């Protein structure tokens, strides 16, 4: 039971006795709103005007929430587990100490979820696609920051999403209340104290009758002067020459300005319909991403040259998202979604090698890219008794890109790409066994103007999920699915660009889509304050598109091809304890990834161990949070892409709608770096990238919001789409 003021400010919270009785003590006279919630029942709201010091409310009846009880396994007082999702109900303490939806997500410590405030990101450990939603509507992290914790009913954590979510591995859906009048405004600002780093968020929402108007804006400036790299390369040229070069980096400049704007209008004309229109504008201006240093010939100490590698790039991505949902009789739903996106990208890279003022190598790559895309989707759902459901869907993506490459020569590419996806899925239950059977068909089409040959592929994508409830506290789940992966437009371009004095990057228009086979097994157990999640998976991708390098005269050509196969064995174990006395909570995750990469002319294996840990301490109005992530390294083709070693420590104080805090990134190390390697027999490298300012970076945080109006239950959006592929071939080492 939560007692709030009329503007939703938290006053007090209690739990009922076994007989359902409750009392709020020392409550001043005034106007209040009482929020009553219980697992398995719809949340109730009672407006209390002119409350005296002693008030008897009499019997209160809550309506049964069938949506929360059909085919579920109750695993605790704050969580309900289904076959495809968890319904997570934050505690009063967690909501009270959090300033927004991102802070609350950190407090919940859900499996695989990583919050990286350094990069203003919510992601998955080890990568993979994560979808964020608010009442089913596609959202970005800055929109999640705009959510008041008091408005959150629950968070739906889909760790086993169905076919309609595409290739998403996890979906986080914030189910929030929608004011029928009034609205809310707020700001969340973080600023570095010893370097130019910031995350600035402004947001607002206003409701009038059946309409809702909202906006959110994020700006993230970064200006570092301590970025550099150390690199070791070894080249074996076709004429038998072997060269080993060492690059010793010097501190250089890294500047970046990120901008995200969301403007939304939604109309709920009736309880059975919802229309939403969202205009998004994404942008990133990166005028400096510069490296400089000295190149040494390891076999000849007198062979020394100066190196400069500067990149100036920017992109802008406006999009319009139109969504309509109509609920029909007999638990049927129709959903329509159309998204149009324009992506403009500019990039200039200057690479020079010189000695005594004489330029030996001079590479100037300029790229101008324009991409237009349209995504249209329709979904039908039919709900049956006991949680059984049937769904069908059709989506099509059509894109066109025009790219100009200038590097001493002029290249122009015009590419068309189409992707059609049809699926059907049935979810059912037999006693303690929940199952989900699905099948999808995919068509991929690609054509580059000026080329006679077009590419068209079809694939069959089945999926199956078996979820067995072993007890009220544990379950075992097996999943197997097959899906299609298509080449990016940038990789398909036949343009070539010089990388340095020895290397050339070249696309491959003959790339073909390939199949991905995935299976995983999950065991979960929860009892009281203890939670354990064990997970193992195997991935097999024959004919995967991976990198390769070939000799061509006195040059090494970097390109891509359909290789033999790529495989990965993964294992992960998570233990979470808490909240202890609603004050202390901590979690630990450890795991291993074993990669097997088999190319047409190479074969590599690599094993990576990793761990993650989090701890939070909440006492009265103070909260302390600590997080550490060790390297989760990925190996693809012949390239090892290193993860980040991240630590974060922060302490906050919250008073009503105001929260202030101080924190530090990597407070216990002065050697932040990201490692990467390539194991090719003709041109290998080992690179360490450093940003000095990312170690012992101290910051302050300020969050404030205010709201007005009442709340009511709103319709929930079912799908989201977006296009984030620029269609441009990358440059640089």
Question: Where in the sequence are the language-model features?
Answer:
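A short, solvent-exposed loop/turn motif at the edges and junctions
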Residues: 4-9, 31, 35-47
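Short, acidic Ser/Thr/Gly-rich low-complexity loop/linker segments typical of extracellular
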Residues: 6-21
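Coil residues (strongly favoring Ser/Thr
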Residues: 7-8, 64, 432, 501
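Membrane-proximal, glycine/serine-rich, low-complexity loop/turn segments characteristic
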Residues: 19-21, 25, 35, 49, ...
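C-terminal beta-barrel architecture of Gram-negative outer-membrane proteins
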Residues: 203, 590-597, 607-654, 658-686
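Outer-membrane beta-barrel translocator domains and adjoining extracellular loop/strand segments
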Residues: 226-241, 288-304, 346-357, 402-411, ...
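Face-selective signature of the C-terminal outer-membrane beta-barrel domain
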Residues: 258-286, 308-453, 457-462, 469-473, ...
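Outer membrane beta-barrel strand-and-loop segments of large Gram-negative receptors
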Residues: 373-375, 508, 512, 518, ...
């Amino acid at each position: 039971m939560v007692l709030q003021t009329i503007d939703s400010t938290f006053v007090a919270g209690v739990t009922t006795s076994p007989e359902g009785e409750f009392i709020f003590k020392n409550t001043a006279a005034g106007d209040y709103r009482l929020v009553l919630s219980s697992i398995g029942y719809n949340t109730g709201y009672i407006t209390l005007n002119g409350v005296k010091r002693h008030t008897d409310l009499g019997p209160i009846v809550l309506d049964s929430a069938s949506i929360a009880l059909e085919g579920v396994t109750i695993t605790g007082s704050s969580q309900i587990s289904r076959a495809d999702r968890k319904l997570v109900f934050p505690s009063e303490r967690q909501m009270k100490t959090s300033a927004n939806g991102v802070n609350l997500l950190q407090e919940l410590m859900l499996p695989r979820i990583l919050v990286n405030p350094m990069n203003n990101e919510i992601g998955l450990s080890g990568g993979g696609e994560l979808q964020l939603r608010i009442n089913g509507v596609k959202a970005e992290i800055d929109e999640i920051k705009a959510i008041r914790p008091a408005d959150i009913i629950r968070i739906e954590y889909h760790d086993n999403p169905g076919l309609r979510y595409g290739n998403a591995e996890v979906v986080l859906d914030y189910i929030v209340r929608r004011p029928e009048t009034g609205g809310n405004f707020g700001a969340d600002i973080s600023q570095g104290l010893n370097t130019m780093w910031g995350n600035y968020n402004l947001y607002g929402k206003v409701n009038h009758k059946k309409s809702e108007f909202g906006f959110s804006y994020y700006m993230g400036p970064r200006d570092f002067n301590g970025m550099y790299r150390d690199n070791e390369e070894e080249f074996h040229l076709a004429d038998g020459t072997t060269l080993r070069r060492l690059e010793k980096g010097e501190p250089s400049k890294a500047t970046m300005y990120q901008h995200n704007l969301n403007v939304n209008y939604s109309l709920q004309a009736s309880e059975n319909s919802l229309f939403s229109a969202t205009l998004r504008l994404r942008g990133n201006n990166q005028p400096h991403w510069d490296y400089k240093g000295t190149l040494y010939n390891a076999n000849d100490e007198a062979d020394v040259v100066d190196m400069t590698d500067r990149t100036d790039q920017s992109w802008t991505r406006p999009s319009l998202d139109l969504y309509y949902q109509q609920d029909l009789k007999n638990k049927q739903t129709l959903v329509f979604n159309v998204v149009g996106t324009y992506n403009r990208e500019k990039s200039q890279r200057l690479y020079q090698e010189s000695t005594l003022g004489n330029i030996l190598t001079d590479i100037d790559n300029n790229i101008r890219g324009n991409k237009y895309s349209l995504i249209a989707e329709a979904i039908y759902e039919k709900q049956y008794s006991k949680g059984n459901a049937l769904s069908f869907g059709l989506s099509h993506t059509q894109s066109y890109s025009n790219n100009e490459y200038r590097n001493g020569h002029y290249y122009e590419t015009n590419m068309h790409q189409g992707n059609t996806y049809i699926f059907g899925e049935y979810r059912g239950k037999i006693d303690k066994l929940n199952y989900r059977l699905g099948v999808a068909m995919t068509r991929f089409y690609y054509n580059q103007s000026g080329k006679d040959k077009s590419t068209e592929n079809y694939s069959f994508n089945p999926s199956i999920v078996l979820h067995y409830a072993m007890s009220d506290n544990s379950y075992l789940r097996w999943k197997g699915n097959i899906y299609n992966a298509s080449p990016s437009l940038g990789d398909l371009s036949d343009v070539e660009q010089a990388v340095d004095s020895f290397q050339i990057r070249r696309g491959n228009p003959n790339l073909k889509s390939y199949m991905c086979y995935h299976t995983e097994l999950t065991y979960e157990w929860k009892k009281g304050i203890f939670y354990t999640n064990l997970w193992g998976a195997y991935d097999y991708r024959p004919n995967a598109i991976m990198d390769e390098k070939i000799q061509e005269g006195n040059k090494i050509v970097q390109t891509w091809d359909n290789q033999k196969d790529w495989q990965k064995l993964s294992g992960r174990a998570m233990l979470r304890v808490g909240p202890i006395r609603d004050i202390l909570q901590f979690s630990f995750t450890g795991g291993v990834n074993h990669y097997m990469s088999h190319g047409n002319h190479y074969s590599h294996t690599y094993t990576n161990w990793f761990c993650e840990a989090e701890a939070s301490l909440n006492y009265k109005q103070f909260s302390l949070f600590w997080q550490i992530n060790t390297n989760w390294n990925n190996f693809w083709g012949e390239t090892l892409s290193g993860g980040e070693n991240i630590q974060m420590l922060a302490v906050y104080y919250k008073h009503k709608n105001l929260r202030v805090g101080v924190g530090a990134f990597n407070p216990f190390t002065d050697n932040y770096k990201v490692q990467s390697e390539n194991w090719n027999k003709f041109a290998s490298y080992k690179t360490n990238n450093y940003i000095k300012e990312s170690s012992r970076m101290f910051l302050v945080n300020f969050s404030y919001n205010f709201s007005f109006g009442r709340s009511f239950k709103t319709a929930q959006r079912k799908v989201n789409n977006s296009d984030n592929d620029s269609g441009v071939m990358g440059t640089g080492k």
